[in-house]
Amino acid sequence: MSETALNEAGPQVLEADGIRIEFGGRQVLSSVYLRVQTGQIVGLLGRNGSGKSVLLQTIFGARAVADASVRVNGRRVVPAFRERGLLNYLPQEPLLPPSLTLARAARLLGVDLENATARFPELRPQFDKRIGELSVGSARLVQALLLLHADTAFSLFDEPFSGVMPVHVETLAEEMQHLKQRKGLLITDHRYAEVLPLCDVVYLLHQGRLLRLDGDVREQLRDYGYLAG
């Protein structure tokens, strides 16, 4: 959805609940309710193995879960990825085929590559390179930028900063802040120092439950043992 159309239509609200998942008899997710709206960056924190990736997969529709409900403005959309222009998803593993050039990948996603990389001039000489020829960090950065600039109402990012050079992490975070004006972002990353300053809302996955943290988020994270005192 274009920025003009979004402003005219008002914010869209993505909600997910009813998600219960067990692995090997261990309940990974229960009592889950999550809300993201356009114009927001929402952070999803939790320890390794807490179910962050599974939750993103379920919201996107890549993982079928009985009784899971994903809604946009109250309308059920399961699987959500089939809803044109609704959302895209960057998993932890590489998303795009390594044989694709950057230019071809951008065309497939309907993204203006010049615009998407405007703050990363060092990527310009690599437009005709295959994604598999890039460094791990550059490939991750490019894929995050392409999904960020793609014309969807929401973007789900699982560890978007992983492997990205620190100087690029800062600029990518600034790009996210800028583009949240026209879409909603749901981000999970173990690098809480980069994620927390970005977020309008923070959720914590703790012992299978999804907790919305209000007030002093860092203090609450310390209380739950997520951050050192």
Q: Positions of the model-derived regions?
A:
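Conserved structural motif at the start of ABC-family nucleotide-binding domains
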Residues: 14, 29-31
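The feature captures the beta-strand-to-loop junction immediately N-terminal to the Walker
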Residues: 45-47
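Helix-to-loop junction immediately C-terminal to a conserved catalytic motif
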Residues: 60
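ABC ATPase NBD coupling module
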Residues: 63, 74-88, 222
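Q-loop/switch helix immediately C-terminal to the Walker
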Residues: 93, 98-113
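Conserved ABC nucleotide-binding domain
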Residues: 116-136, 151
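Walker B catalytic motif
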Residues: 159-160
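Conserved beta-strand-loop-alpha-helix hinge in the C-terminal portion
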Residues: 209-229
